[in-house]
């Protein structure tokens, strides 16, 4: 059996840990010796008596993944973000999970037994064409977006707003995400910064509804405004990237970068090993909550 899997980089344990990588816990220690791929192949054979070979590859962005699929790349299981899951559901790309997938009485239903209640609730409540995300997807990771910054060069106040991406003080010293969803979200936050941070807006009784409306405005005028803004920001940014900002921050090539929270933690941990402090700020205007989940392609 060949199982073709496409996932984000650094989303699974690939094994071969050194002694320096050991995680010490009160109950013992953790050291990854085997790749989770090898462990899964062995586990599958032990439980089902069949040999499975995992062909594992990584994606750079959701848009890159979608283009790969439309060009004919063939996978069995992929791990896109929620907005791409919704698109794939709407376009009938996906197989639903089995009827007993969430049955906690089944011994091997580890997901149903261990899934975060927050993720389960989110995937149950959000729907496309009347069907919940959980009918097709198993939530895997979630997080927020924000700004990783060097506190020796950037103040917390400067990093706590989306307008940092067009701040000329940091010209060619800041990175921005190279994907449609995240770059446009940051642009909207920057363009509408004054309004989103105003007391009258924040204290309005329907704040959440108004915020969602502002951040999801797809009117032609707003989209044109976003495109113009991002074109101008290109002259201020060091790069539009998907993964290189982690290294660029650690090596000091840039002083701030727009990052997903998981990458932010990794970046700060790596910098800390070199006695180099980096911080993470969530923009005051609002932030982007994301979910990545496993789905099966037809």
Short names for language-model regions:
Residues 1-87, 91:
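Early extracytoplasmic/lumenal segment of secretory-pathway proteins
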Residues 71-79, 93-94, 170-172, 251-259:
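Alpha-to-beta junction loops
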Residues 146-153, 189-190, 291-298:
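A bilobed periplasmic-binding-protein/Venus flytrap-type ligand-binding module shared by bacterial periplasmic
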Residues 271-298:
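Extracytoplasmic/periplasmic substrate-recognition and gating elements
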Residues 176, 183-187, 195-279:
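Ligand-binding pocket segment of bilobal, Venus flytrap-like solute-binding proteins
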Residues 163-180:
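Short loop->beta-strand "edge-of-pocket" segments that line small-molecule binding or catalytic clefts
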Residues 152-160, 192-202:
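Short helix-loop capping/hinge motifs at secondary-structure junctions, enriched
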Residues 51, 55-66, 83-142, 156-163:
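Hinge/lid segment of periplasmic solute-binding proteins
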């Amino acid at each position: 059996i060949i199982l073709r899997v496409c996932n984000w980089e650094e989303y699974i344990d690939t094994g071969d840990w050194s002694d320096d990588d050991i995680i010490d816990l009160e109950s013992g220690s953790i050291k990854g010796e085997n790749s989770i791929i090898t462990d899964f192949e062995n586990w599958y054979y032990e439980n089902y008596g069949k040999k499975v070979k995992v062909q594992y590859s990584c994606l750079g962005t959701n848009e890159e993944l979608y283009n790969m699929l439309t060009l004919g790349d063939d996978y069995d299981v992929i791990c896109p973000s929620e907005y791409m899951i919704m698109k794939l559901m709407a376009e009938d790309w996906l197989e639903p999970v089995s009827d007993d997938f969430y049955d906690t009485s089944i011994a091997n239903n580890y997901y149903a037994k261990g899934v975060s209640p927050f993720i389960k609730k989110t995937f149950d409540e959000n729907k496309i064409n009347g069907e919940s995300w959980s009918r097709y997807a198993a939530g895997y990771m979630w997080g927020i977006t924000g700004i990783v910054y060097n506190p020796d060069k950037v103040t917390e106040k400067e990093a706590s707003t989306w307008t940092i991406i067009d701040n000329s003080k940091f010209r060619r010293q800041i990175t921005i995400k190279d994907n449609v969803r995240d770059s446009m979200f940051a642009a909207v936050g920057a363009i509408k910064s004054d309004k989103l941070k105003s007391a009258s807006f924040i204290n309005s009784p329907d704040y959440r509804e108004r915020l969602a409306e502002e951040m999801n405005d797809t009117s032609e005028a707003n989209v044109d405004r976003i495109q113009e803004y991002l074109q101008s920001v290109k002259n201020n940014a060091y790069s539009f990237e998907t993964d290189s900002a982690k290294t660029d921050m650690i090596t000091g090539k840039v002083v701030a970068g727009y990052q997903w929270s998981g990458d932010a933690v990794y970046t700060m941990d790596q910098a800390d090993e070199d006695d180099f402090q980096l911080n993470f700020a969530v923009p005051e205007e609002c932030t982007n909550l994301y979910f990545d989940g496993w789905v099966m392609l037809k």
